[in-house]
Amino acid sequence: GSEMCIRDSTNGIVTVNGHSYEGAEKQTENTNFALLVAKHFSEPFKDSNGYGESIARLSNMLGGGVIVQRFGDLMRGRRSTEKRIEEGLVKPTLAATPGDLSLVLPKRILDGIIEMIYALDKIAPGTANDDTLLYGVEVKFYNMEVEIDNNLETRYKGLYIIGDGSGVTHSLSHASASGVYVARKIIEEM
């Protein structure tokens, strides 16, 4: 089981994150996962981190911090209430303000999250249950991408950039996989 937690950014913005625990004493009945929707902007827009920060600030303004919403309420176009959350099957693991994430998240991002919840429901039935709790927002701030080729190699022969520092990967599993990939490429070239 796992639980949600609060994360403060360096700019005083409160966002959400999750933890999974190995020890039985800290486990809950819940499972948590993040649904991250990447947005790649075209010219002339250049401040994707500022865009993400403004979404997080809006969430903080509307909810005084992290917002929680039942999936069923989101799909019915209504704000969640403490009463509906308390009556639900899923017990919250984070003190958050019941609210309406559709007032915070841009439509394309919200549509991507909803689409993914329904896709997950096909392989993990119950994911799209009315009582599923959505906490928001979680915003990832990524660095600029380093100029690399399809093999993660820079213009300097033999200099590879792997992991999240490359600006290409955005998770521990992707970062690890990029390291394995480059190691295999180097061995192959020996």
Give a label for each model feature.
Residues 96-169, 176:
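A glycine-rich dinucleotide-binding beta-alpha-beta segment and adjacent secondary-structure elements
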Residues 47-48, 171-174:
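Short acidic, glycine/serine/threonine-rich loops at helix termini
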Residues 1-5:
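Short, small-residue-biased leader/transition segments that mark boundaries at the very start
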Residues 175-190:
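Internal hydrophobic alpha-helix adjacent to the cofactor/substrate pocket in enzyme cavities
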